[in-house]
């Protein structure tokens, strides 16, 4: 499955791009989530406007390969609150088909590394999120 990503230029928020990527093999311990629906509100504009100062751009960093070169510091993915469905799982505590509500990128899919999994919640334990606020 391909994934589509809505990118925003960090220094010029009205400059945007759509980029597609083929799905990579999912490593052990990760899940792939299809972002089904998300809300676009004034909060999202705040996330973009204060992305550097408040570290919002760091939640879903742009891979250099997504832009065909190292422009990853120039572009970002605005975080959104929404609903997703697990389409692939290599994690023993998360089943394919589970529905999730949470903090996602403006992308059609996202790969997560579930930690602190319980009956009603999980956190993304991706290394780049280790220093970021846990509520997101």
Where are these regions (language model features)?
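Short, compositionally biased
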Residues: 111-134
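A composition-driven signal for long, intrinsically disordered, charge-rich low-complexity tracts
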Residues: 7-8, 81
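A short N-terminal beta-strand-loop micro-motif at the entrance of redox/enzyme domains
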Residues: 9-38, 42-45, 49
């Amino acid at each position: 499955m391909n994934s589509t990503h809505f990118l925003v230029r960090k220094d010029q928020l009205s400059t945007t791009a759509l980029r597609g990527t083929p799905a990579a093999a999912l490593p052990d311990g990760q899940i792939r989530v299809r972002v089904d629906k998300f809300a676009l509100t004034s909060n999202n504009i705040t996330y973009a406007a204060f992305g550097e100062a408040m570290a919002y751009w760091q939640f879903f960093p742009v891979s250099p390969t997504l832009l065909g070169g190292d422009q990853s510091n120039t572009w970002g993915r605005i975080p959104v609150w929404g609903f997703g469905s697990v389409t692939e799982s290599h994690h023993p505590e998360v089943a394919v088909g589970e529905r999730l509500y949470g903090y996602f990128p403006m992308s059609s899919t996202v790969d997560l590394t579930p930690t602190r999994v319980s009956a009603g919640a999980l956190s993304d334990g991706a290394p780049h999120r280790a220093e970021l606020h846990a509520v997101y």
